[in-house]
């Protein structure tokens, strides 16, 4: 595979993209299908590194599943209860937060002796707030290296009860607790401390739990009530919707250099908050239309904006590079959690935007981008972060080529991203 990829200037973007399945939905659905009673067929499952890490972990834990040849359909035989390993295990989860956090919680239900570990970057991604909450519910968890970070040793013991969890760093901690709580012996009450970030991702979790037969009552996202002693039930067939974060690159490309691009697999009915990205493009001046299972974007005269994007942290990255093509500065606010993702995305984004000529102010939890009159050809570092690679592909929508280092890092969520982009592109 190429160590670098040079994208030549693109004159026009036009066409339709059938989106790969959502990463957030795929890994949640796999775990719930494994815990549920009955067999679940998951359709449009994402085939990517993060999903493979979840599948490998479930297999090691005794879950049986059958994958179609293209790995997008998966039949999972549910265990009808807890994940329990017969012997001590070590599970390697790469850099998949959507596997590490929910599994860390789910494995606390049984009596286990399991080590969860991953790539070096995973060991820099905080998990202390989740561990604190699980311990309040009786779980025995040890840090094997640095306090508050993986790798973890999990011995089980979670019973439920009254928990508090800090909501200000990652919504995945709450997601992990919510998915685990119905299988605990006792009822669980989860109180959120601080501002709950990425709230729409909690809606994805609640939607999936409901699909598997479990309802959660919450008081304005501040207190969540979950009955204990429940069993998830397979819905039979579950369709994974397209990945809205992945859609953002194609919609932005159309806003800059359309033509018109239609992304299918998400739309008006979508459970993913990242579909709100289309509203941001519309505010900037793009033309957007919605169907039940598609979003369409056409070019418009783009203006810079100043916006709180806490609700769409992943797609907000795409706005940072779209800003290179807008008239006037763009400010993206309330995105502190960029700093604890695949890399410190605030610092990485500021560094690479400056390389292509932008004037950038990097705050603790915001970024301000002033586009240059002319973009500069540059080699873009991707920091082993799939979204950095995809965001900076948009630079090629100018008169300037761009070189993306380590383009294969997109395998985390979208292995054939560059092929899909090329298919829609007319080269200048």
UniProtKB/Swiss-Prot annotation:
Chief place where the protein resides: cytoplasm
Record-level GO BP terms: amino acid biosynthetic process; aromatic amino acid family biosynthetic process; chorismate biosynthetic process
Function: Catalyzes the transfer of the enolpyruvyl moiety of phosphoenolpyruvate (PEP) to the 5-hydroxyl of shikimate-3-phosphate (S3P) to produce enolpyruvyl shikimate-3-phosphate and inorganic phosphate.
Subunit structure: Monomer.
Gene3D superfamilies from the UniProt entry: Enolpyruvate transferase domain (3.65.10.10)
Annotated residues for binding of 3-phosphoshikimate: 23-24, 28, 170-172, 198, 314, 337, 341
Pfam (any one): EPSP_synthase
Molecular function in Gene Ontology: 3-phosphoshikimate 1-carboxyvinyltransferase activity
Family matches, as InterPro entries: Enolpyruvate_Tfrase_dom (IPR001986), Enolpyruvate_Tfrase_sf (IPR036968), EPSP_synthase (IPR006264), EPSP_synthase_CS (IPR023193), RNA3'P_cycl/enolpyr_Trfase_a/b (IPR013792)
Amino-acid biosynthesis in keyword set: yes
Transport listed as a keyword: no
Native species: Yersinia enterocolitica serotype O:8 / biotype 1B (strain NCTC 13174 / 8081)
This enzyme's EC code(s): 2.5.1.19
Protein name: 3-phosphoshikimate 1-carboxyvinyltransferase
PANTHER family listed in its UniProt record: AROM/DEHYDROQUINATE SYNTHASE, PENTAFUNCTIONAL AROM POLYPEPTIDE
Binding site for phosphoenolpyruvate: 23, 97, 125, 172, 345, 387, 412
Protein keywords: Amino-acid biosynthesis, Aromatic amino acid biosynthesis, Cytoplasm, Transferase
